[in-house]
Each structure stands twice: as structure tokens, then as C-alpha cells.
């Protein structure tokens, strides 16, 4: 399903082909779910489809929100919120599924955070937890892929957006309280920006070291 999703979202040069693939992808997804065939591959495919497909072209199709709920349901059924916390080297091939599962779970959180921003006032699909923080840190530590290094930053940003929304949701706050909250959020954002700079510098040094050792 992951390969199917990649082919679908990358076929944007042909509108007709992409629409056909999109419809077929949705049919296969629903058929698998109805048969109880829930897997990490299915979840990864859905995440790629939600993140990269031109959904505005399928006006009669299932909404992004409903597709995201399918992702969260699959993640729950697969137990992705309670995976092992053991940090091992990427060389341990037995842990490949766990690492991919953790990336998928973080993907669920990232997408739900962004989609929830477009639906103010509604209950959050997925909230920040210590489990998400642990997964991000573990993947950044093992650093199997270059993108793993940014997981802690993405979690920080998503949690920050969640914090902003909850702070100012539906409440007429007194001016002094608002100023206090704005100051707190501003300080937190500056902290995130500093962490991003440190992570970029660390990544740059690592790349330079890797390049030198190759020669």
C-alpha cells in the first residue's frame, strides 16, 4: 500500500491517471479495513496519501478528516502507542518494524496537529503525550535516516501549536493574563528556534565528519 500511495501522489503530471489511482487506492483501503487487514504498510500508505495527494481534485471522495481517523484507528489496533522503549543501533534488523512503526505514529501526530488547526473549536484528534516525545528522542538518537534528527523539533512545534490553541480557546481572558500567556508562549517559541539551530549545527558537523572519513 505504501508503494501504491507513492505512485498515486507522484502521478500529478496526468490528472486522469491520478484520479483513477486515487479512486482505486481508496477502494483497496476500504476493502482491507472491512476484511480486518490492518497493517503498518496500510497505515504508511494512508499517511503518504493524506500528506501529499491533491485532495481538492476528489470533491466527492471521503474527507481528509475521515481518512485521518482511519489512520488513528489502525495505529491504535497495532498498539503503536505502547512500543518498546529500547534504543538500539540501526544495525539491529529485528527492530526495523518498531522503528518504522514509531515513525508512522509520529506521522499520525504531525498530520493530526496540522489538520486540527483548520478545525478550530473541535476536539483534538490526537494530543501530545510523553510516548511521542520518547519515540522522537529514540529515533533521533539512533539516527538511521537523516530525517530522524528533526523528529524532536517537529514534536516541539506540534506541541507548541497545541499549547497556543488550548491557551486561547473560547475564553475571554483578562488583559494581564493574556500578556502573561503570550510571554510564556513567546519564550517557548524562542527555545524551539534555538533547539532548531543547535540541531542544524549538529547535523552539519556530522555531515562534514562523514564526508571527511569517506575520503
Predicted regions span which residues?
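Extended, leucine-rich alpha-helical cores of fungal transcription factors
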Residues: 1-4, 15-83, 90-107, 111-128, ...
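Protein-protein interaction and targeting regions used for scaffolding, dimerization, and localization
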Residues: 131-133
Amino acid at each position: 500500500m505504501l508503494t501504491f500511495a507513492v505512485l498515486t501522489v507522484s502521478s500529478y503530471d496526468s490528472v486522469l491517471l491520478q484520479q483513477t489511482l486515487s479512486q482505486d487506492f481508496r477502494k483497496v483501503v476500504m476493502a482491507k479495513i472491512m476484511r480486518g487487514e490492518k497493517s503498518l504498510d496500510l497505515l504508511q500508505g494512508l499517511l503518504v496519501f493524506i500528506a501529499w495527494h491533491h485532495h481538492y481534485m476528489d470533491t466527492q471522495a471521503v474527507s481528509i478528516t475521515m481518512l485521518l481517523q482511519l489512520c488513528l484507528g489502525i495505529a491504535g489496533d497495532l498498539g503503536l502507542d505502547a512500543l518498546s522503549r529500547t534504543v538500539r543501533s540501526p544495525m539491529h534488523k529485528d527492530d526495523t518494524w518498531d522503528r518504522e512503526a514509531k515513525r508512522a505514529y509520529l506521522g499520525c501526530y504531525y498530520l493530526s496537529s496540522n489538520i486540527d488547526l483548520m478545525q478550530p473549536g473541535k476536539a483534538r484528534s490526537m494530543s501530545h503525550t510523553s510516548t511521542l516525545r520518547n519515540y522522537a528522542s529514540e529515533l533521533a538518537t539512533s539516527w538511521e535516516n537523516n530525517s530522524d534528527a528533526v523528529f524532536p523539533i517537529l514534536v516541539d512545534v506540534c506541541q507548541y501549536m497545541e499549547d497556543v490553541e488550548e491557551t486561547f480557546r473560547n475564553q475571554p481572558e483578562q488583559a494581564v493574563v493574556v500578556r502573561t500567556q503570550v510571554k510564556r508562549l513567546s519564550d517557548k517559541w524562542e527555545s524551539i528556534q534555538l533547539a532548531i539551530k543547535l540541531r542544524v549545527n549538529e547535523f552539519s558537523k556530522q555531515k562534514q565528519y562523514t564526508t571527511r572519513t569517506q575520503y
